[in-house]
Amino acid sequence: MSEISGIRREYTLGELHNEEVPSDPMDLFNAWLEVIRDSDIKDPTAMSVATVDENGQPFQRIVLLKRFDNHGFVFFTNLESRKAQHIANNAQVSILFPWHSLDKQVAVTGIAEPLSKTEVLKYFMSRPKESQIASWVSKQSSPISARKALESKFAEMKAKFSQGDVPLPKFWGGYLVRPKSIEFWQGGEHRLHDRFIYTKKEESWEHTRLAP
């Protein structure tokens, strides 16, 4: 096995001071996301979503953030997927935005709520047609024999939907994650990182600096 214990670097790209922390965490998230979007980070909206199964076993996967506002964070998925099955059983999830190349990360805990069909359809119709077709092809998280099976099914569905709009699959939808806590981490020199956690208190937020 490779020796990896010596892999490390200093975090020197910034600090997060008390006076720079706004009362609303979504304002800080928006400001950080703008910085990330202006950088050369690929997939700036990629986030890890963690769910747990009925035995308490956690699972993680990368999805794309598609919208955020004062209500929370939105993503879309196959409703027959493992993550959707987990959420149906336990709607408590966590999200992580791993912006490590800029020494930043944002960790969110919250409750995942299904989006309305109207919201889902609006987003689905904005997707490239090939992505819409792909939504019909994959029975997400189920075993398949080979990639060729997917490619054959895609070709079949592409021919089927060659004319007109691609309909929204009944098994495709999305979630709004309403945050209960949002933690911002800014890497610091000598491992003296800056951490601030926001906690939802009824309709307002409280924030606290945490030791690294």
UniProtKB/Swiss-Prot annotation:
**Residues of the signal sequence?**
none
Biochemical pathway: Cofactor metabolism; pyridoxal 5'-phosphate salvage; pyridoxal 5'-phosphate from pyridoxamine 5'-phosphate: step 1/1; Cofactor metabolism; pyridoxal 5'-phosphate salvage; pyridoxal 5'-phosphate from pyridoxine 5'-phosphate: step 1/1
Reaction equation(s) it catalyzes: pyridoxamine 5'-phosphate + O2 + H2O = pyridoxal 5'-phosphate + H2O2 + NH4(+); pyridoxine 5'-phosphate + O2 = pyridoxal 5'-phosphate + H2O2
| Domain of life, source organism | Bacteria
Where do the annotations place FMN binding?
Answer: 61-66, 76-77, 82-83, 105, 140-141, 185, 195
Cofactors per UniProt?
FMN
One biological process term from GO is:
pyridoxine biosynthetic process
User: In which residues is substrate bound?
Assistant: R8, R9, E10, Y11, K66, Y123, R127, S131, R191, L192, H193
Assembly: Homodimer.
Task: Give the main EC class.
Answer: oxidoreductase
Family classification: Belongs to the pyridoxamine 5'-phosphate oxidase family.
Taxonomy of the source species: Bacteria, Pseudomonadati, Pseudomonadota, Gammaproteobacteria, Alteromonadales
EC number in record: 1.4.3.5
- The molecule here is called Pyridoxine/pyridoxamine 5'-phosphate oxidase
